[in-house]
Amino acid sequence: MDVRQSIHGAHAKTLDTQGLRNEFLVEKVFVADEYTMVYSHIDRIIVGGIMPITKTVSVGGEVGKQLGVSYFLERRELGVINIGGAGTITVDGQCYEIGHRDALYVGKGAKEVVFASIDTATPAKFYYNCAPAHTTYPTKKVTPDEVSPVTLGDNLTSNRRTINKYFVPDVLETCQLSMGLTELAPGNLWNTMPCHTHERRMEVYFYFNMDDDACVFHMMGQPQETRHIVMHNEQAVISPSWSIHSGVGTKAYTFIWGMVGENQVFNDMDHVAVKDLR
């Protein structure tokens, strides 16, 4: 488990390139036949990836001491979106087939969660967010047909994109976790511009669907003290509540967003005009 401390905005603005990457970038999300796990003290979110190829993968009691529990989801809820080939997630003996861009919400209290790929030639890539939970909501599969798509932006401003809301109150109940997938239209490069912060929630972005020769300049920092982190395919970045979170790519890309915090009101944002950015 890679543990990241909370950080004040006044401290963050003093960091150099490597300092910013050390604090906020999750450089390696998928490792064959293993799970990766980054624990952030910012709202205590856990993010990572699971890519089973030759064997099943599960999170065992080895994390219990670090989390102060007997098993991973004793006091947590889990959201998973599969960006790879078809796979299965077995929750306490109940098997769910999770295809490409299918998702699974797993409620607090699930003791055994086992991940597997159906075809080792095209393994599943399960990206997950995990947050503290106060009660148990039912485990539920969500398919792309069930999400709430919203198309925003314009080709003229290079920010036309479709936001697919997987785990939001209109689709299913969770304690605090919200997740979704945003896909830029071909030829569009910007996400979340004009940008915003939200003091009541933190957020994690996971960028993917990027060619090897492409990158995204992820914009972060306080609106009057902006910085950037260069992101490559299948990397994630932590965004504190005081930070903007936007990006511009060398080509179109897709990203998964996950939020935890005070509420689940998607439009509860503190908007920042482009003219006010520094």
From Swiss-Prot:
Alphabetical GO biological process terms: D-galacturonate catabolic process; D-glucuronate catabolic process; pectin catabolic process
Highest taxon of source: Bacteria
One Pfam family in the UniProt entry: KduI
Gene3D superfamilies membership: Jelly Rolls (2.60.120.10), pectin degrading enzyme 5-keto 4- deoxyuronate isomerase, domain 1 (2.60.120.520)
E.C. numbers: 5.3.1.17
Catalytic class of the enzyme: isomerase
Entry-linked InterPro entries: KduI (IPR007045), KduI/IolB_isomerase (IPR021120), KduI_N (IPR027449), RmlC-like_jellyroll (IPR014710), RmlC_Cupin_sf (IPR011051)
Binding-site list for Zn(2+): H196, H198, E203, H245
Keyword Flavoprotein assigned: no
Keyword Isomerase included in the entry's annotation: yes
Keyword terms, alphabetized: Isomerase, Metal-binding, Zinc
Function (record text): Catalyzes the isomerization of 5-dehydro-4-deoxy-D-glucuronate to 3-deoxy-D-glycero-2,5-hexodiulosonate.
HAMAP family reported for this sequence: KduI
Family according to the record: Belongs to the KduI family.
Protein's name in the database: 4-deoxy-L-threo-5-hexosulose-uronate ketol-isomerase
